[in-house]
Amino acid sequence: MAYSWDNRVKYVVRYMYDIDNNGYLDKNDFECLALRNTLIEGRGEFNSDAYANNQKIMSNLWNEIAELADFNKDGQVTVDEFKQAVQNLCCGKSFDGFPPCFKTVIGRLFKTIDINGDGLAGVDEYRLDCISRSAFSSVKEIDDAYAKLCTDDDKKAGGISLNRYQELYAQFISNPDEKCNAVYLFGPLKEVQ
């Protein structure tokens, strides 16, 4: 159940975008994401120009996501609305077929994971990304998930490139197969309540 399509989409809403933990997406989440991304990209340093840029990007993203997924136009995107939007707009498609706002979100997320800026998400960055959202008592659990996620080419390259990350993310939210390696993109999953 933890790797079912339904749970993966719930996971994305709950742990990736519902920053204020109120159970739905709204404008505030994207305002908080602007600050979060600015601080992560600056490795803790606050840059007002980068923040202004991130505010603009996240405001535009919220407006696009609200247009695509806020079906009842109440200023909130519930988990069910988000799932319906993903099903309508993403299921069965590769990254290239996704709406522009989804592509932007995925690219911005990769930037927050690639802490050292080398263009790859290595095991060290993967570990940090995983523990920022979930509790683990053993690094082996995280490392095993990374090993299942990576192909031989990823391992030779030293990590997951942006292009590979984009395709993995696309599979994570659009592929119903619980056994595809993309289900490990965000680490070992637990069932979202």
Curated annotation (Swiss-Prot):
Disulfide bond positions: none
KW Repeat (keyword) present: yes
Activity response to pH changes: Relatively stable at broad pH range (pH 1-11). Dimers are formed in strongly acidic (pH 2-5) and alkaline (pH 10-11) conditions.
Binding site for Ca(2+) 2: 70, 72, 74, 76, 81
Matching InterPro entries: EF-hand-dom_pair, EF_Hand_1_Ca_BS, EF_hand_dom
GO molecular function, one term: protein homodimerization activity
Residues reported in the UniProt entry to bind Ca(2+) 1: 18, 20, 22, 24, 29
Role description: Like parvalbumins, SCPs seem to be more abundant in fast contracting muscles, but no functional relationship can be established from this distribution.
Record note on quaternary structure: Monomer and dimer.
Name the record gives this protein: Sarcoplasmic calcium-binding protein
Organism this protein belongs to: Scylla paramamosain
Taxonomic lineage of the native organism: Eukaryota, Metazoa, Ecdysozoa, Arthropoda, Crustacea
